[in-house]
Amino acid sequence: MKKLALLGSTGSIGTQALDVVRCIQKEGDGAVEVTALAAHSNIRLLEAQIREFKPQAVAVFDLQAAEQLRAAVRDCDVRVYSGMEGLCALAALEEADIVLNSVVGMVGLEPTLAALRAKKQLALANKETLVAGGALVMQAAKENGVEILPVDSEHSAIFQCLQGMHTKSDLSRVILTASGGPFFGRDRDALRDVRPADALKHPNWDMGAKVTIDSSTLMNKGVEFIEAKWLFDMDPADIDVVVHRESVVHSLIEYRDNSVIAQLGVPDMRIPIQYALTYPRRYPSPVRRLSLADWQKLTFFAPDEETFTCFGACKRAIGRGGTVPAAVNGANEAAVALFLQEKIGWLDIGEAVCAVADTFPAQRIACVGDVLEADRAARAYVAEKFCR
C-alpha cells in the first residue's frame, strides 16, 4: 500500500486524484491510502475531504484559513499545519510514501525539494517546479535516488512510451501534442478583444483557470517543452510540438530507427494521475475506454508561433538558461492573474512573457533564493508595466 500526501487537494488535479483513490478503494484494492492533504484556502472542501479520507495531517497555505480549519475539525484526529512551512512538512511527512504535488504556481517549488530531500516518491503535477528550478530539482532527485513520476498528460505519455527503451541512445526525439486551445486558427487581430470567459472555454480538457488560460496562449506548451527537457534529459533541439485538436494522442517518441510510439486515450486527467499514483502497477480506471472507431480522423498541425508568442518565448528562455525560465514563468503568472481580473488584454500576456524572455539577465542558479528572486523581479516588471 502507498501512503499518499496530496498537495493541492482542493484544486482540479487534487480532486481528480481523490476520485482515482475512491475508485481504487471501491475495487477492493488498498493500493493507495490518503495520509495527508494540503490546500491553499478552500477549507470548506478540505474539511469535507478530511472527514471522508481521515488523513493524519493537513496543511493550509493561508494562515487565517488554517486557523478557521483548526476550529472546524477539532473533533477530528488530524494535525493541522500552515504556511509554506506546513506544505514542506507534509511533503517530507514520515508517514507518507508518495507525494503528489499538484499546487499551482511557484509556491510548489520548495515542497518539491522537501519531498525529494526526504526521499519520497514524487508524482509531479506542478509545472512551475521544473520550469523555474529544473536544475535544482533534478539534482536533488539524483542525489536522493528519487524517480520523478510525471502527471501532465503529455509527459506521462512520454514516460509510458519510454518504458520499453533499452538505452537512452536509442531515443531520437520526443513529440509533445497540444490541443491548440480555444483560439486555434485565429490571427492576432481576432484576439485583441478576447475576454477571460472566452479563454476559459477549453475544447477538450477540464482544468483549473490558470492552466486553461495558459492553454489558450500556448504558454502551457512552452512550459511543457521546458519540463520535457529536464524530465527526460533532452536537448531542446530534439523536442518537437504538434497541434492535435482531438487530444487523443497524448504524446509520441521517435527512436533512432525512425519507429514512432504514441500513447493514446480519452482526454481525462485521471488516467495519468492514476498511473503516477500506482506506478509501476496498473488498475481498473473510472475513465471510459477509447474507441478509435468513433474517430473518423486524427489531425496534426504545426503550432502558430507568430500568433501564440508565449510558446516561442519559452523556447528562447530555455536556450538562454539560468534564471530566465524562472523569470518567464513569473511574468506569465502575474500577467495571467491580471488578465483574469480584466486589467490587461489577452495579447498583453504574450507581450510581457516575450519581453522578459528576451531582456532579463541569465543569472546562474546556485540556490532556491536565486529562483525566487528572478520570479519576484519578473512579477515586479509586469506590475510596473501594466499597473502604473
Residue ranges and their predicted role:
Residues 1-388:
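Catalytic, metal-anchored helix/loop core of enzyme active sites in primary metabolism
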